[in-house]
Design a protein with these regions (language model features):
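Hydrophobic/aromatic-rich core segments of domains that either
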Residues: 21-94
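Acidic/polar residues at beta-strand termini and the immediately following turn/coil
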Residues: 1, 69, 185-187
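Generic detector of short, locally flexible boundary/turn motifs and exposed helical patches
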Residues: 3-5, 21-25, 110-111
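Soluble non-cytosolic domains of exported or imported proteins
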Residues: 14-22
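Secondary-structure boundary elements
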Residues: 1-12
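N-terminal accessory/pre-domain segments preceding catalytic cores
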Residues: 11-12, 92-196
Length: 196
């Protein structure tokens, strides 16, 4: 019974466990209930070089379609950072096709206007802008920095640059009791850096 439930909304709401299909169906029900158009997309995903069947969502916001993969956000950086990640929140085709392939033809998703990072103004085109964002946030007392960098396969390098920049700042100030953790997703360009 649990195996069947994991592929539908019952698994999500009754057992708090589900496979991607159950999660995508639950997202559809919840978003449709608040008048956000949403469909379940089936296809395959590639993670660590393996292709596996997968389901995610396509939402329509202000007349623009976006890909939304709550399953992958649940399993992304949040577990190690104790936070809710938004790596796969309202993506364009250009980003989603790096790891997802739909079984059927879908509407073209070309906008990033309602992407989590665009809405929060945490998308940067250059490394120095990301560094400036981190420095300003650090001055404001923030200890966690979550942003997106444009460009192919640059997130890891930017996260490393921020990491070393923060280490230099701490070294200059004689701070020795701080640790820095960083995680980057090169596929969608997200970086999460935490000082603890």
């Amino acid at each position: 019974m649990r195996m069947i439930a994991s592929h539908n909304i019952f698994g999500v709401f009754a057992h708090h466990r589900a496979q991607c299909e159950g999660i995508a169906k639950a997202v559809k029900v919840l978003l449709n209930a608040v008048d956000i158009k949403c469909i379940v997309v089936t296809g395959e995903s590639v993670k660590n070089g393996k292709k596996v069947p997968h389901a995610w969502n396509m939402v329509n916001i202000d007349g623009q379609p976006y890909h939304l993969d709550v399953t992958w956000d649940i399993g992304a950086i949040g577990s190690s950072f104790k936070r809710i990640p938004y790596d796969y929140f309202n993506l364009s085709d250009q980003l989603i096709i790096k790891e997802h392939k739909a079984d059927t033809q879908l509407p073209t998703c070309s906008s990033m206007r309602h992407n989590y990072f665009a809405v929060n103004k945490n998308t940067f085109w250059m490394k120095n802008r990301a560094l400036a964002y981190v420095e300003k946030a650090l001055q404001n007392g923030d200890t966690e920095f979550y942003f997106r960098i444009e460009g192919d396969n640059v997130a890891f390098d930017v996260a490393e640059s921020v990491y070393h920049h923060l280490k230099d700042i701490f070294s200059e100030k004689g701070i020795t009791d701080k640790r820095i953790k960083r995680i980057a997703n090169n596929y969608v360009g997200t970086c999460c850096i935490k000082i603890y």
